[in-house]
Structure formats: structure tokens, C-alpha cells
Amino acid sequence: MTSLQYFSLNRPVFPATHLHRPGIRHLQVSACANVEVQAPSSVKKQGVSKEVMEAAGRVLVGTYARVPVVLSRGKGCKLYDPEGREYLDLSAGIAVNVLGHADSDWLRAVTEQAATLTHVSNVFYSIPQVELAKRLVASSFADRVFFSNSGTEANEAAIKFARKFQRFTRPDEKQPATEFVSFSNSFHGRTMGSLALTSKENYRSPFEPVMPGVTFLEYGNIEAATQLIQRRKIAAVFVEPIQGEGGVYSATKEFLYALRKACDDSGTLLVFDEVQCGLGRTGYLWAHEIYDVFPDIMTLAKPLAGGLPIGAVLVTERVASAITYGDHGTTFAGGPLVCKAALTVLDKILRPGFLASVSKKGHYFKEMLINKLGGNSHVREVRGVGLIVGIELDVSASPLVNACLNSGLLVLTAGKGNVVRIVPPLIITEQELEKAAEILLQCLPALDRHG
């Protein structure tokens, strides 16, 4: 039975009692001029999405302010709702689906592995896990890998590794380094440790007290960071080479170099969070390669398995030597299925010419956006590297994002809500980028209507 059949049963699946959902904002979107909007094919089919959304309102916890769209299938850079309406996907599941949807090589690898072995615990060895670790080590600064299930879990592991490292390397100190440095506009996750490293106060405040000992500094402020690292007992500095959720801000080489030097001088670990910006998105395999500055620990997740849940913590031998049996663990992480999927993603990204094509398409797209949108009074800046692009506005980005949605284009917001974030599948074509730029241009008047 398909999901569409399930939600089309004549007999109600759930009680018919109406449940009001307070606090959930229902977005109102309107079509943009000169952009064709496909109409739902029938009243009957319209009901499928309606039934799904109504059922979700009854049974799901209201943690997401969802847009009123149900996505039921995808191919390449296109997504479709149950009514058959097509969307050009420049969100990629928030920088996850780097190979697009239903990539044939990825699908074959996952199907074959699922028919062979899906899950074993980490009490045992499995071939795909070891092979993936070997590939990650061979293509990075790292010597060893710890697998997790998500980006926030990867950062939680990095927190624990940093504290254990400080105790291991300085056993005679009565009070080893336990504090952390993070930066403005940072996002490192939503579990209690990684949440403590996330700068946005409204993410943290409902759950206070979170992990103590975190100091937030201005992103890019070399003097403040250097002084604090030298003065305090800092276990690790967490930094995103390119901030995605924070608004698509790129670090400077001088800033990352200064962090590296200050950490080396003080015995502090440097952690690069590349959960969103890593694995080819910038046109480099790792975002920090742009700057020629290397960390002690790097956390990965979103794109690694091409849509399946995975995270990874890459560490040097120096860090790994501090970690022993029982220091950390997880039931599901590094399973054969997700690791086989990740091997396929890595294989395709590392093919000759793939990363160069990402860089080329990213440059082409950014220049096109500057030319098409730069003259609009609401557009402050178009920035980014490769295929992580931000369009900063002087007003809320929501009206533009919503109008694009209604016109068949999926993009995201970021920063303080005034940045349009674009993180498409890395396989996107120049023609698809041109179409996206044209829709963005045609939808700009939505900013005036809601200004």
C-alpha cells in the first residue's frame, strides 16, 4: 500500500475531532507575475495533500512551521507533490541531497546493500563502515573517523573528544581545560551540548540551563578570539568555515589562520563544523581547503550519505589517542546501509571534473544573480562560494521565499530571516540555475507588497 493510498482511504484513519493547532503559522503565498504556475489536476487529487496535512496536524508534534506543500517523489533536481505539481529544488533537503533525488548509482548501491545487510551493532565490524572510514581518511587531514547519525551528534562527540583530550594530555592539572569558544551567527545543532554552541538565543533560551562554559565571540574578530584563547582554559574552538544557517558568511583566511595559531600556542583544539559547507558544496571537497588551514577535528553530516542519516567526526591521531573503549558510542551509526550510500556519494564527488563543475556553476550562478537582482533596492548583497549562495535583503526574505514556492522554486531563509539561502543539489545544470534566477527575478515584487 502506497502512502497516497493510505491517506485516500474512505474510512477515516484518525478520529474526526477537529484539533486546533495554536502557534503554527499558515503561510499565505501568491503567484508572481510572468511565471507559470501549474494548477492541481483535479479536486480529488487536491484532497490528497489536504488529507496529509490535516493528519500531520493531529499526530505530529508541532516543532516545524511547515509550508503547505506535501512532497511525494523526486528525480534529479525536481520534486513533485501528490497532485503532480513540479518544483525546482534549490534547497536539497537543506544541503543534503547533493546527488539530487533518485540518483541511479546511489539507488543501486542502497538497494543491493539493503538486500545484503542493513544493520549490525558496533560490537562487530562491517565492511562498508571500514571502507568509508578509509576513504575519508585518504581524502582529508584526518587519521581516524568516528561515525554518528547526524550533525548535532557529530558535534556532541567532538565536545566529548575535546574534553577527554585535555584531561588525557594534561593529567597533572587539577582543573583541565573544559570551556569552549563559538561565534556569532553560529549553528552547531539542537541537542544540549551542540545547542550550547549555537549563538541564536531563542534556540537556547527555552531549554536553559544548557551546557555551561561557552563564550560567544564576533565571527571574524581575530583580536578577541586570540586574547580569549590565550587567557582562558579553552578545550576547543568550534567554527564554521562558511556559516550556512547563520546567513552564508565566509571566514577569511586571516581569521582561520589566527585561530589555528592561537590554538597551537595554547594547546586548544580547533574544530571545523563542515556539516553544511563540506563535501563538495564549495567546489572544494572540504571548505577549509579554500583557506589552506586545517583543524584537529572536523564534523560532517548532511550530504555524506546523499539523503540517509549519517554524521562523522574526523580527527587526527593526536586526538584519537586520547579516546578509548567506552568513551563514546552509538547503536545505529556507521551501519552498512548508510555507509554504502556514503561511499557512492564520495565516489561521484571525487570523479574527475565534478568539483570543478561545482565551482564553475557556482560562479556562473552568483554572477547571474548579481546581474539580475543587484539593481533591486531590497538586495544588499549576493555572496557565497560554489553552490552555497546567500542573497541578503533589507527586509524579511519570507515573502520572496513564499512567492518562489508558489511559482515552483524551493529556496530557504537564513540569518536573521533576511537572507535567501540557496543550496541546490551539486548535479544541478546551468539551465536549471538560469530558470531559478528568472523565477527569483520575477518574484522580487513580493518584497514591495510585503515591505
Curated annotation (Swiss-Prot):
It is found in: Mitochondrion. Keywords: Amino-acid biosynthesis, Aminotransferase, Arginine biosynthesis, Mitochondrion, Pyridoxal phosphate, Transferase, Transit peptide. It is an enzyme of class 2 (transferase). GO terms for biological process: L-arginine biosynthetic process. GO terms for cellular component: chloroplast stroma; mitochondrion. Pathway: Amino-acid biosynthesis; L-arginine biosynthesis; N(2)-acetyl-L-ornithine from L-glutamate: step 4/4. The keyword Transcription does not apply. PROSITE patterns: AA_TRANSFER_CLASS_3. Coiled coil: none annotated. It catalyses: N(2)-acetyl-L-ornithine + 2-oxoglutarate = N-acetyl-L-glutamate 5-semialdehyde + L-glutamate. Involved in the biosynthesis of citrulline. This is Acetylornithine aminotransferase, mitochondrial. It comes from Alnus glutinosa (European alder). The lineage of its organism: Eukaryota, Viridiplantae, Streptophyta, Embryophyta, Tracheophyta.
